[in-house]
Regions:
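P-loop NTPase motor catalytic core
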Residues: 1-188
Length: 188
């Protein structure tokens, strides 16, 4: 069975978690997850099962330049199966539309984030057993809405406008990525 990068990542994270906790007694590894959808101008929490209430997700930066997101659910997960189930269930809430090319065409971008906190007993703490080192990691998996040729999708009305907006957004994103990789623009 050929699985994608996210299921392989999930299996690898929990395999490594078990290995580290076995090799480093006292190490604690905690894993949380979030799943956001960007549709048009709005951000939606795909892990919030009560979709009838429009909860506001607030995205801002702190003075250090870190992106902070408030209002989203971030459940803790204990197993690879639990994490995969959360991803699968959240994916069911993605905004889709039917075109002649795809019955479930994604109309949004999605960001699936896995947060890993590793706490190791500090080797410098001779007598203080409460001292520890904390290592935090974040892995973002981004699924972009695909570009569409209107002549092939035969989209009309709302779906046509969404397709045009998706294509414009992907064009701008492509320009940003090229600019980030352009050596002549480094430092600007």
């Amino acid at each position: 069975l050929d699985v994608g990068i996210v299921p392989r990542f999930i299996d690898d994270v929990f395999r490594r978690k078990a290995q580290i906790e076995k090799e480093r007694p006292g190490c604690e590894i905690v894993i949380h997850v979030s799943f956001l959808e960007i549709y048009g101008e709005s951000v939606r929490d795909l892990l919030d099962m009560d979709q009838s209430i429009n909860k506001e997700i607030i995205i801002r930066s702190d003075p250090s330049g870190n992106v902070l997101i408030s209002g989203q659910k971030m459940p803790q997960v204990a197993t690879a199966e639990e994490l995969q189930e959360i991803l699968d269930n959240g994916s069911l809430y993605r905004t889709t539309g039917e075109t002649s090319m795809n019955a479930f065409s994604s109309r949004s971008h999605a960001i699936f984030t896995v947060y890993i906190d590793q706490e190791f007993p500090s080797p410098d703490a001779c007598d203080d057993s409460s001292s520890s080192d904390l290592r935090q990691s974040k892995f973002h998996f981004v699924d972009l809405a695909g570009s569409e040729r209107l002549t092939r999708t035969h989209a009309e009305g709302r779906l046509q406008h969404e397709g045009i907006d998706i294509n414009k957004g992907l064009l701008v994103l492509g320009k940003v990525i090229r600019a980030l990789g352009d050596e002549k623009l480094k430092g600007r």
